[in-house]
Amino acid sequence: CLVGSEMCIRDRSRHMIAVTSETSPLAKSDDYLAAFFMDDYIGGRYSSTSAVGGAVLSLAFGPDVFAQFLKGAAEEDALAKEKDLSKNPAMLDALIGVYERNVLGYSDTAVLPYSQALSRFPAHLQQLDMESNGKSVNRFGEPVNYVTGPVIFGEPGTNGQHSFYQLLHQGTDIVPPQFVGFKNNQMEKDVVIQGSTSQQKLCANVAAQIVAFACGKDDEDNNKKFEGGRPSSIIIGEKLTPAAMGALLSHFENKVMFQGFVWNLNSFDQEGVQLGKVLAKRVLAHEIDGALKVYSDLLNI
């Protein structure tokens, strides 16, 4: 049926599903083919492996792909329970991040995936990390006297190289990059140009950037001099498969959780999101005064 058509609205129980919590009014409705439930306490940024992600991914790619995605996430979750730090990559990554933030004083982290398929992944991690650990009070509601979550930003590798890498290499602030790279292209066919594949060229750029950040380059011309000494980390996979994607998501979710433990934060609420929503409703209801009225008038609301 055509979305919005009378027939579609009348027969939506044959064409639509609901993903909701069991306490939602949707859970008791007969207007949907099926309802899939998620727990009330699961925030959107942690919902990729819940019914929210399952419904979308299964419809788009099939249930087998979603099953592989879950398998990769589950395997990474199992590693997060390891007591041996050398076998627990999420914990190790979390502690490196805490050291960079609280000991070295770096306020930002750049996430740099060398795969166009992960072009929106830095934006997801931006929400995951900053919404979870961008807090100034601990889980007991007490103000903290130390810095917490960093600013997260990023772009796919070679795009970033021709934009903000300049600041990462020669800027006055040190921003630790976190690279994500894969040995093999997820596409079965790759092109060979001048003796190397496109994937090999991507990997060559990753290796070059890591060494450039660490070692720098001396030059009599200060404008061409690179101080080096800029730390970075890298996550390497064989190929970006559904299982690898699930593992990657799980890795960063556990990393954020571990950092929340260290900083004694509640990484699973987002009170900072609510204030803007409340004020926006006041603006639309014209219940405003002071600065809120000034900006409402300025924007002709």
Task: Give residue spans per PLM region.
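Acidic, Ser/Thr-rich peripheral helices and adjacent loops at domain boundaries
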Residues: K189-N222
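Generic long, charged, amphipathic alpha-helical segments
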Residues: K217-G229, S233-I234
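Extended, charge-enriched "interface" segments that sit outside catalytic cores
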Residues: G195-L202, A214-C215, G237, Q259-F261, ...
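Active-site phosphate/pyrophosphate-binding segments
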Residues: R10-K189, G228, L275-L279, L284-I301
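C-terminal structured subdomain/cap of oxidoreductase catalytic cores
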Residues: K224, K239-L292
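Short conserved micro-motifs at the rims of enzyme active sites and ligand-binding pockets
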Residues: F121-H124, S163-Y165, K189-S198, N223, ...
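Single conserved hydrophobic/aromatic residue that forms the stacking wall/gate
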Residues: C1-G4, I9
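Generic secondary-structure boundary/loop-capping signal
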Residues: D39, G43, V111, S115, ...
